[in-house]
């Protein structure tokens, strides 16, 4: 299971921006965003709906990898079920964070390729933060490490559920969804 939990976040660095690049950018490019703005839904409801659609797709892809777990169980491998469940939960949270960043990137532009590039840049920065600690002043090292997605995922992949990790994931998701909503509201009135 450790190999799956090590490689999946790397795949997510490009897969999730590809999934989320068209969430809002396609609506803008096709001109349907004006129609959506006239509907009786609030901007945050629209953003949340787009975000949840991408998270659903990510979780569906994650469910397919359960075949790996069931195969290991069938061949008699000794599996720590707590760590496996926490690892899958952590992968879902990492996917949710990256999807929120991708949703924000998609709201910034009407070009899907540009949205993809912005999203890849954002998620790579969040993934690399704890790997760049040697370049950071000692006083900032703890903060920079705490901002890294990989730092929090590593705890979950080992089977450790810490409230700090859950608060981190919820905060980053909320932050990007808030930015997306505000960005769309500003552009709505332009």
For the regions a protein language model found, what residue spans apply to each?
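Secretory targeting signals
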Residues: 2-6, 11, 52-112
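Long, hydrophobic alpha-helical segments
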Residues: 3-26
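Flexible extramembrane loops and terminal tails that flank transmembrane helices
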Residues: 34-45, 110-114, 181, 185-190
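Helix-loop-helix units of permease transmembrane domains in multi-pass membrane transporters
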Residues: 23-53
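Transmembrane helix-loop junction
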Residues: 26, 38, 70-74, 107, ...
